[in-house]
Amino acid sequence: MKKLHVLFLSMALILVLAACSLDNGSTSKESDKGASKDSLTIGLSISTLNNPFFVTLNEGAQAKADALGAKLTVADAQDNASKQASDVEDLIQQGVDLLLINPVDSAAVASAVEAANAAGIPVITVDRSSEGGEVVSHIASDNVAGGELAGQYLTELVGKDAKVVELEGVAGSSAARDRGEGFNKAIAGQLNVVAKQTANFNRAEGLTVMENILQANPDVVGVFAHNDEMALGALEAIAASGKDIKVIGFDATDDAQAAVKAGTMAATVAQKPEEIGSKAIEAAVQYLKGETVDASIPVELELIK
């Protein structure tokens, strides 16, 4: 009887130890899961950090990453599509969990997106889209609608049949394409575009291009620039010429808003770069946690005048 009692005690002890082992295993899995959440690494390939808009977008992304406990690794493509392809490859080799890509060129970036797809790394495009590859989501303002806002207001300012200029962004970028599409849709049959040239979203180029346009077209009365940097460059050329020309930009950077307030710039279409960056990180973390993310996440626009 004594032997039987000992046997029962031994069996009970084995069961208790087994239960403890199971509990420890469950806790370990939960800890591992929590660790993976805390150690998410997100790569951001950004078109340029030499533009206030994208600096603010990057800051919004970093702030949200910090808040959510994610690590953000940023690569500045310096407005060079080839460098961006190399940057994306580097981020893939680093083993990031997800890639945020703000394309320099929407067509050229497709191969980089496809490379990430092949490596099993999900991609979210930010502000500008990719013309190829698979993306989880696209986060941006409605650039076509923004171009329409600019076109409608410029028509209101300068009147029907007035001669105007369109300063275009980087050729091949979806932002330049979409803003131009919206602008031209709004002014069709209303305004006469006498010059349409790229200034690559750059203030210095905006100045030079506008100087040349004014020499050939001294009777221009309005300008739509695909971003504020080009608009501000155009304003310098206009000021030097002594002409009164209405200029509308896009992005609502601090300098542009100051120019609108001062009365030198007619208006700027306000994007919210900080919110775009923040939403991008938010969507990335949600996706990596297995949550559903919308294929398109819009950010509202408004006209500041």
Spans of model-derived segments:
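Sec-dependent bacterial lipoprotein signal peptides
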Residues: 1-18
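Bacterial lipoprotein signal-peptidase II cleavage site
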Residues: 18-37
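Extracytoplasmic "Venus flytrap"
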Residues: 41-64, 68, 72-90, 94-96, ...
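Flexible loop/hinge segments that line or gate small-molecule binding clefts
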Residues: 98, 106-145, 156, 163, ...
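Hydrophobic alpha-helical segments within soluble ligand-binding/sensing domains
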Residues: 42, 84, 139-164, 205-207, ...
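Hinge/cleft segment of the Venus flytrap/periplasmic-binding protein
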Residues: 167, 171-175, 186-187, 272-305
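Hydrophobic alpha-helical
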Residues: 98-117, 183, 200-258
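Short, solvent-exposed amphipathic alpha-helices that sit
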Residues: 53-70, 146-150, 174-191, 205, ...
